[in-house]
Amino acid sequence: MSNDALEAAIESAWEIRDQITPATRGEVRDAVEATLEALDKGVLRVAEKRGSDWHVNQWAKKAVLLGFRLKDMEVHMGGPQGGTWWDKVDSKFAHWGEAQWQAAGFRAVPNCVVRRSAYIAKGVVLMPSFVNLGAYVDEGTMVDTWATVGSCAQIGKNVHLSGGVGIGGVLEPMQAGPTIIEDNCFIGARSEVVEGCIVREGSVLGMGVFIGKSTKIVDRETGEVMYGEVPAGSVVVAGSMPSKNGVNLYCAVIVKRVDAQTRSKTSINELLRD
């Protein structure tokens, strides 16, 4: 099916989603499976950049959700000491052999988890981390230990997600658009970006920066307060702002624009990408 045909089929299926079960066959199952496969291969994305704007393919997100209706719970093997898991979503790596790994061209360290319908591009390094379904991780990115890439999140090229970073998903609670980290960003350890916020190209978030839709993002130089988006080339740290009754509340502070000194501290190590 073409993307237009898939979209039409998914939108129709969405209207009768309460009637869809693991026993459902025919066009609904075919359309959902084809969409999940396209997401898994990276030929379709939940969100794609058009110029400077991001366009969300809401129907692709709906297909991810419909996949839960079509699949029954089953045992997943491979747990410690012969243990198992109980889930509906297959591993991206299910039934992979050396040929599939060679073709994929990324590195997956033992104990990383990637669920089917997430796309991982060539040159990516996955430390023991978690990438949820529908996500897109572009070339040359490092997903460091205990980092989480949430459902349908979009991660750009040559991004570094440091240890324990959380990139929010869109499925629960439901969000209109995915969280997006654009190319060449560095996200410091234990930082969180959630609720469909966007970190624009080349930005650096220091350790422990938390950004959601209601988080004030303050430009120290101009005093401007913004929400939901970090401008390109920003260096952001955790801060606070005065509120009512002498109480200070958390905010994220743009302390400067990325310069050569910042780049020297946050540049990726090509030796780790070979």
UniProtKB/Swiss-Prot annotation:
The lineage of its organism: Bacteria, Pseudomonadati, Pseudomonadota, Alphaproteobacteria, Rhodobacterales. It catalyses: (S)-2,3,4,5-tetrahydrodipicolinate + succinyl-CoA + H2O = (S)-2-succinylamino-6-oxoheptanedioate + CoA. Belongs to the transferase hexapeptide repeat family. PROSITE patterns: HEXAPEP_TRANSFERASES (PS00101). PANTHER family: 2,3,4,5-TETRAHYDROPYRIDINE-2,6-DICARBOXYLATE N-SUCCINYLTRANSFERASE (PTHR19136:SF52), MOLYBDENUM COFACTOR GUANYLYLTRANSFERASE (PTHR19136). Substrate binds at R107, D144. One of its GO terms (molecular function) is nucleotidyltransferase activity. Its EC number is 2.3.1.117. This is 2,3,4,5-tetrahydropyridine-2,6-dicarboxylate N-succinyltransferase. It is found in: Cytoplasm. Keywords: Acyltransferase, Amino-acid biosynthesis, Cytoplasm, Diaminopimelate biosynthesis, Lysine biosynthesis, Repeat, Transferase. It holds the Pfam family THDPS_N_2. One of its GO terms (biological process) is lysine biosynthetic process via diaminopimelate. Homotrimer. Pathway: Amino-acid biosynthesis; L-lysine biosynthesis via DAP pathway; LL-2,6-diaminopimelate from (S)-tetrahydrodipicolinate (succinylase route): step 1/3.
